[in-house]
């Protein structure tokens, strides 16, 4: 099936957006385009599936050879239980090059099937969504095929809502996290400490930076391209496989968080809470307790 002109998918070729969409599809890397073509040809034969849309980096035209495909499969509510049970089989029906897949409980999305196809190897996320719930979404995926406008109608019920960072939520947790990772450093659990620093970047620092810049993003995804100056600042929080480097990285993470918090509050006189004062003092004492007092000499 040709992805541009099949009567099976819902795009009206005389619609004004169709040439742009065709151009975007034509510009995809060969393996992404081939996978989409095979899936479009097959999805119309899957009982209970009534729509296929593509989201993620495709929406912004940012797919490159390293990108995955984020696909949404709309399911008739009555077929929902059976479709969930058959997700692995459906993944193989959509493209016979299916190698393996697992469900997305690790990211809080059990409707997701994380798949690997190939060769050539391609990561594809298949999100199976009941039409009853399809309006609840974080973005507007591009609909490639649907039955009787059902997915378009579902999306029209509500606007997408991207989960923005919540500075108050982060503040309520940051200092407890910082103390926990300080203890990991002092105990000598360096790899645990490095994991902790990664966590702070993904859950606190990068989300606040993206919030301040008005950019919708998850974790540190593509931060090098979207916020290059801040990405350079983040380098100070990476640490190394030794105690001194981890202490310096944690100190930098706290300093950077303080700057981001100040910007998020739109004022410079953010009063330190008791937990912040205690944890700051605790971290400031790390070099002395670890015999690193002369590290700057």
Residue ranges and their predicted role:
Residues 138-169:
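A short, charged helix-loop
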Residues 40-44, 52, 200:
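Hydrophobic C-terminal alpha-helix "anchor/cap" residues
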Residues 18-47, 58-60, 66, 73-126:
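Metal-dependent nucleotidyltransferase catalytic core
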Residues 51-54, 128:
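Hydrophobic/anchoring residues in structured secondary elements
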Residues 119-149:
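Hydrophobic alpha-helical segments and helix pairs
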Residues 64-67, 138-139:
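Short aromatic-enriched loop/helix-cap "lid" or pocket-rim segments at secondary-structure transitions
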Residues 2-4, 11-18, 158-297:
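Conserved nucleotidyltransferase catalytic core and NTase-mimicking acidic/glycine-rich helix/loop elements
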């Amino acid at each position: 099936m040709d992805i541009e002109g099949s009567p099976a998918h819902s795009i009206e070729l005389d619609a004004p957006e169709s040439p742009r969409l065709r151009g975007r599809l034509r510009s995809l890397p060969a393996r992404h385009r081939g996978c989409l073509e095979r899936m479009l040809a097959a999805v119309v034969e899957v009982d209970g599936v009534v729509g296929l849309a593509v989201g993620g980096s495709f929406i912004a035209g940012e797919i490159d050879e390293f990108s995955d495909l984020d696909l949404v499969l709309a399911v008739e509510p009555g077929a929902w239980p059976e479709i969930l049970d058959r997700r692995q089989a459906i993944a193989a029906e959509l493209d016979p090059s299916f190698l393996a897949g697992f469900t997305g409980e690790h990211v809080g999305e059990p409707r997701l099937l994380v798949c690997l196809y190939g060769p050539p190897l391609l990561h594809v996320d298949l999100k199976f969504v009941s039409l009853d719930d399809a309006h609840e979404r974080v973005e507007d995926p591009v609909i490639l095929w649907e039955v009787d406008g059902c997915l378009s109608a579902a999306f029209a019920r509500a606007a997408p809502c991207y989960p923005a960072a919540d500075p108050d939520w982060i503040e309520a947790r940051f200092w407890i996290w910082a103390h926990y990772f300080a203890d990991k450093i002092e105990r000598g659990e360096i790899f645990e400490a490095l994991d902790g620093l990664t966590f702070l970047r993904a859950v606190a620092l990068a989300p606040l930076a993206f919030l301040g810049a008005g950019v919708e993003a998850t974790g540190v995804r593509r931060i090098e391209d979207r916020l290059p100056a801040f990405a350079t600042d983040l380098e100070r929080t990476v640490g190394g496989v030794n105690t001194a480097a981890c202490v310096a990285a944690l100190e930098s993470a706290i300093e950077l968080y303080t700057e981001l918090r100040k910007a998020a509050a739109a004022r410079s006189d953010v009063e330190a809470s008791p937990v912040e004062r205690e944890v700051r003092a605790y971290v400031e004492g790390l070099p002395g307790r670890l015999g690193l007092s002369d590290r700057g000499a």
